[in-house]
């Protein structure tokens, strides 16, 4: 987890139902939420069955916010990809996976906040939703990636090796939405 707001939610519950033991790490503690330039050492992914990189309220490219630790996360994602460890990147996590593998991330033409539908090339992999969204950025995919879902704002899902990146939030719970709203989210919704 990148912060105290996000949690594995529905994805974590499904993994546990299937017998996986979850190990979660929090990069930015609650008291540093508005000053997230912390030091953090990411674990090596080699012994894991799966890496899930969740959302975050910051932008992957915002050096003042994430510059002190994003390099470590990008290295972890590159190594997981190299080793063939499956990666699920959600929102910020998908943007980090994109960046780690040679793509780029920038501002979206408009934010997406709330429930949206998407167009999917493979509905068995990515149903068309509606999906919950809360983001301001979009990905320009790395060379190896294949876009599998989109809408008029941005790529919504892509595959790359054994990785899957999604811009929406399949893990979302009402508890996390309330946390988003309590931490600057109400102001974002009013814009």
Label the model's feature ranges.
Residues 2, 27, 92:
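Cofactor-binding loop segments of dinucleotide-utilizing enzymes, especially the Rossmann-like FAD-
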Residues 8-10, 62-64, 97-100, 142-143, ...:
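Short glycine-/acidic-enriched loop or helix-start segments at secondary-structure transitions
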Residues 13-88:
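Flexible gly/pro-rich beta->alpha loop and the following alpha-helix that scaffold active-site loops
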Residues 42, 106, 120-191:
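Amide-donor transfer/coupling interface in amidating biosynthetic enzymes
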């Amino acid at each position: 987890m990148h912060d105290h707001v996000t949690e594995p939610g529905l994805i974590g519950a499904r993994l546990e139902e299937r017998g996986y033991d979850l190990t979660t790490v929090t990069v930015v503690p609650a008291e540093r939420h508005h000053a997230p330039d912390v030091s953090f050492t990411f674990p090596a992914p080699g012994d894991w069955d799966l890496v899930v990189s969740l959302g975050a309220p910051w932008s992957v490219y915002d050096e003042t916010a994430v510059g002190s630790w994003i390099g470590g996360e990008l290295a972890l994602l590159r190594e997981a990809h190299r080793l063939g460890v499956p990666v699920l990147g959600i929102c910020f996590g998908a943007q980090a996976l994109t960046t780690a593998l040679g793509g780029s991330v920038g501002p979206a033409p408009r934010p997406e906040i709330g429930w949206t539908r998407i167009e999917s090339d493979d509905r068995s992999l990515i149903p068309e939703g509606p999906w919950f969204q809360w983001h301001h950025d979009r990905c320009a995919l790395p060379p190896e990636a294949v876009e599998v879902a989109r809408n008029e704002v941005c790529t919504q899902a892509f595959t790359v090796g054994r990785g899957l990146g999604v811009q929406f939030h399949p893990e979302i719970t009402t508890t996390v939405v309330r946390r988003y709203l309590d931490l600057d989210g109400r102001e974002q919704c009013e814009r």
